[in-house]
A protein has these predicted regions:
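Alpha-helix N-cap/helix-start and coil->helix boundary motif
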Residues: 11-14, 132-133
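C-terminal "cap" of GNAT-fold acetyltransferases
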Residues: 60, 86-88, 122-136, 140-169
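Acetyl-CoA-dependent GNAT
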Residues: 8-12, 19-98, 106-111, 115, ...
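Flexible nucleotide-binding loop
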Residues: 102
């Protein structure tokens, strides 16, 4: 059943957003990112980070089903130094595992793309773990293409590669 409503997040959503982030990371990245890193993720610590981020220049939207936050997307200006000011960035998009393939991810993605375009961005980027074929397939199905840029990222002492994706808005 699809019951997804997408709305701009509020400060009071920080706990729910953090819960989504931790649960999704543990489900999506188990076997990819070191277990120690995933097991050490703390919802209350993440919630405090989300409360602090509410003052940053980026937007966060949530997907709800039956008044429960089941996913979120965060986006804003691109943080990469090698792109123009006309490029936005999808910073994060996560949906609770029991809501995967039910439309919440696509609804959040589509809101992100519409909002970035409405802010005057011509293109957008995002970074995905190279070792995460599920995420890469999701993005590619929505029109994103790897642009050749990669960066290493350390997860609890394990170096992983992030791949940059790009799409026109």
């Amino acid at each position: 059943m699809r019951c997804v409503q997408v709305r701009e997040s509020e400060l009071g959503d920080a706990d729910a957003i953090a819960h989504v982030q931790v649960e999704t990371w543990r489900a999506a990245y188990r076997g990819i990112v070191p277990d120690m890193y995933l097991d050490d993720m703390d919802v209350s610590e993440r919630a405090e980070r989300w409360r602090q981020r509410s003052t940053e220049h980026r937007s966060t939207w949530v997907a709800e089903c039956d008044s429960k936050v089941v996913g979120f997307v965060a986006f804003g200006a691109c943080r990469d130094g090698d792109v123009s000011a006309a490029v936005g960035e999808l910073h994060a998009i996560y949906v609770l595992p029991d809501r995967w393939r039910r439309g919440a991810g696509r609804a959040l993605h589509d809101r992100c793309v519409a909002e970035l375009g409405g802010c005057g961005f011509d293109e957008a980027t995002l970074w995905a773990l190279d070792a995460n074929p599920g995420a890469k397939a999701f993005y590619e199905a929505l029109g994103w293409e790897a642009d050749g840029a990669t960066v290493p990222h350390d997860f609890a002492g394990t170096e992983m590669i992030l791949v940059r994706y790009r799409r026109s808005l």
